[in-house]
């Protein structure tokens, strides 16, 4: 479909797998380390299958997104999966693999742009929206490692 986006992002984090898992599983922590992307997250207590959270986030482009996610899989310290709806609708999966230097992170993100403005502009601005995703993931790469290292202490 024209408004579908599929992203696969991978990188290595110099921090223990358990700490990286804890940071990614608990969306309430995202505004602490995934700045300036995540503005606010409201969640129902500790992360668990079936638990929901609401996110308010933005990229570099001048628009904000509001989503609700529900954890569908939680397999410590390897996998966090969630379904999402709102301005974006789809599924995200974090897969973590232990490496000699820390943790390999893979993020699979398959979403449809349901925000009317995004849906309308996707045929023209898809490259800009993909760039915006890459910018947001770069902020995750910058913030996740130091945050997970602090958790590990």
What are these regions (language model features)?
Residues 16-19, 132, 136:
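Short amphipathic alpha-helical segments
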Residues 32, 41-91, 101-104, 135, ...:
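Glycine-rich portal/gate segments that line the openings of hydrophobic small-molecule binding cavities
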Residues 23, 64, 117-118:
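Alpha-helix N-cap/helix-start motif
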Residues 12, 72-73, 95-97:
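Well-ordered beta-strand positions
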Residues 1-48, 153:
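Hydrophobic ligand-binding cavity/cleft-lining segments
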Residues 83-135:
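Beta-strand/loop substructures that line and gate deep hydrophobic ligand-binding cavities in soluble
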């Amino acid at each position: 479909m024209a408004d579908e986006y599929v992203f696969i992002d991978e990188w290595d984090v110099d921090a223990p797998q358990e700490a990286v898992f804890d940071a990614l599983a608990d969306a309430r922590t995202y505004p602490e380390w995934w700045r300036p992307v995540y503005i606010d997250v409201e969640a129902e207590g500790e992360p668990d299958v079936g638990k929901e959270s609401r996110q308010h986030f933005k990229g570099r482009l001048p628009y904000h997104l509001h989503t609700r996610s529900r954890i569908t899989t939680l397999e410590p310290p390897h996998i966090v999966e969630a379904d999402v709806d709102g301005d974006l609708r789809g599924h995200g999966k974090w897969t973590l693999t232990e490496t000699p230097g820390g943790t390999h992170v893979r993020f699979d993100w398959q979403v449809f742009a349901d925000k009317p403005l995004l849906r309308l502009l996707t045929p023209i601005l898809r490259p800009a929206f993909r760039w915006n995703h890459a910018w947001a993931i770069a902020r995750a790469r910058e913030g996740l490692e130091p945050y997970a290292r602090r958790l590990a202490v």
